[in-house]
Design a protein with these regions (language model features):
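Residue-level hotspots at or immediately adjacent to binding/recognition sites across diverse folds
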Residues: 37, 51-343
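Gram-negative bacterial Sec-dependent N-terminal signal peptides
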Residues: 18-49
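N-terminal secretory signal peptides that target proteins for export/translocation
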Residues: 1-28
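N-terminal processing/targeting junctions
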Residues: 8, 13-17, 36-39, 45, ...
Length: 343
């Protein structure tokens, strides 16, 4: 039976199109990237407060087909060859073969909120979400199957006991079509080495005694993986997921909501609350704050949510209130704008 616990931080919408080295995703235009990640305004998700008791009573049901699926809340997007694939609320997954001009709804076996999507190659992709769901596609996102669901949801729950909370997964990353990782609430860290046929709980591989949430995982070119979470926690893996080191000289103690490598070796950026963004050129040994100014030359104070690296090396980060940041110099500096429809 699951141990009761309280939420410490809200789960936030994010987009992750970052990768590195041999894992770099195929390029796409900046306009298509912006359109994909800004669908439905990219609003932050509210604090997740669904009780596991309520969730357990709901059978797994397929997502409802709707002509409006592409206009609902979509919180992450990825590239599968020349196709864009976006995931979001109510189990909605949509894909576009014309750089975001039109969208088609995929066949999805669940209705829960999906928080992240990642493709290891042109065909094989994984999406994660609430109820610790992990979905897989082998046809570039047109059809999906469920590979994993939190096994504790199927355990009997004492109706007289305290309310229990679910553990959503917040991000997913794959080294290749076989080895990948899914991360999420309360220090959840899952690993597969068979393309998701089986998933092993490897949360004990990371030193996280307080069970802080993990929000983002990204590859850093020429270096390894970076894992970012709440309370300023950062972890790195120089062997791409086999071993993990806790970073102790942290630049900030608020929650991180996103992370991205760049096209340069050892360079990684992380971002979070109130416009806080930091950049490291040595895989996390040292950090420098990135100065972000609004068009009026005031400090940016919007919470930064998701971001991605395009095929041409341009880095885009989006935030609350329609804020869009773009960098063409590997994250040294950013142009800041606010979407006109959000002003």
């Amino acid at each position: 039976m699951r141990k009761p616990c309280n939420w410490r931080a809200p789960f936030v919408a994010r987009t992750d199109m970052n990768a590195s080295g041999n894992y770099l995703k195929k390029g796409f235009s900046l306009s298509a990237l912006t359109q994909a990640v800004m669908l439905s305004g990219m609003m932050a998700l509210g604090a997740a407060s669904a009780h596991a008791a309520d969730v357990a009573e709901e059978s797994v049901q397929p997502a409802i087909k709707s002509d409006l699926a592409a206009h609902t809340l979509l919180v992450d997007a990825a590239v599968a060859g020349d196709r864009l694939v976006a995931v979001g609320s109510r189990g909605h997954i949509v894909y576009s073969d014309d750089q975001g001009k039109t969208w088609t709804q995929a066949n999805v076996p669940v209705r829960q909120l999906l928080t992240a999507v990642y493709f290891a190659d042109d065909k094989n992709g994984w999406a994660v979400g609430h109820d610790s769901l992990i979905l897989h596609t082998s046809d570039a996102g047109a059809n999906w199957e469920m590979q994993y669901r939190d096994p504790e949801l199927d355990q009997p729950i004492d109706p007289e006991g305290p309310s229990l909370l679910e553990r959503p997964l917040m991000d997913v990353w794959f080294k290749n079509a076989n080895t990948g990782f899914a991360i999420g609430a309360y220090g959840t860290f899952l690993r597969t080495d068979d393309g998701g046929k089986t998933w092993e709980d490897r949360s004990y591989d990371i030193d996280n005694p307080d069970g802080f949430h993990y929000n983002a995982i990204t590859a850093v070119k020429g270096a390894g993986l970076m894992l970012a979470g709440e309370m300023g926690t950062l972890y790195r893996s120089p062997d791409f997921g086999d071993t993990w080191e806790t970073l102790t000289d942290l630049p900030y103690d608020g929650s991180w909501f996103g992370a991205s490598g760049t096209s340069s070796d050892n360079v990684v950026l992380v971002w979070g609350l109130r416009g806080n963004m930091f950049r490291s050129t040595d895989f996390g040994d040292t950090w420098e704050q990135v100065e972000l100014l609004t068009p009026n030359n005031g400090p940016l104070e919007a919470t930064l949510l998701g971001g991605g690296l395009s095929g041409d090396g341009k880095l885009v980060v989006v935030g609350a209130g329609g804020v869009v940041l773009s960098s063409t110099d590997g994250g040294n500096s950013f142009d800041v704008m606010t979407r006109p429809d959000r002003i």
